[in-house]
Amino acid sequence: MTTPVLRATPELVAIAWLKTVVGDRVATMLPKPGADGTLSWADGGFVTLVGAGGTPNLYVPLRDPVMGVDCWAVNPGSQKPPWDKAAMLAEAIQAACYDHPAIPKTVTLPTGYPAARVLSAYTTGEHRRITDDASSYARYSIPGLVVVWTEVTP
């Protein structure tokens, strides 16, 4: 039996690009609290994403998925959500989308996956405050982040 070839995926590429913007605090889910109940991401917030659509190019291997992005922040020990901290993460992502000369870059994916070349990144709407969180987390949602990319062939 042969080992399957690992291919770059929209989630992996978007996570890798977002890490160039907000650092190593991006994943598809929020990290679980530690054994002592502490949140490892409380100081700087956290970014989660989920695939929301997009259409691969019909003729060339160019991908342009749309990702739903949520920016999270928390004040441990307080019932007051830190809206400013979550908003700053969303604003950092928006600012990175406007920095057109810095966007084209090759991003490294997890071991075994080929690299991907990000060609463009842009949002499809303004971020908005999500106020229905009973846990007192602050959350801003970006309705669509499009990261245009192609897999780098060795």
Q: Which ranges hold each PLM region?
A:
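Small/polar-rich, solvent-exposed N-terminal microdomains that initiate assembly or binding
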Residues: 1-59, 100-116
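Short, solvent-exposed beta-alpha or beta-beta edge segments that form flexible loop/patches at the rim
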Residues: 25-82, 123-137, 152
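A structural signal for short, well-ordered beta-strand segments
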Residues: 67-69, 142-148
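Extracellular/virion structural assembly segments
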Residues: 74-105
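Acidic-leaning, charged glycine-interspersed low-complexity segments
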Residues: 95-143, 152-154
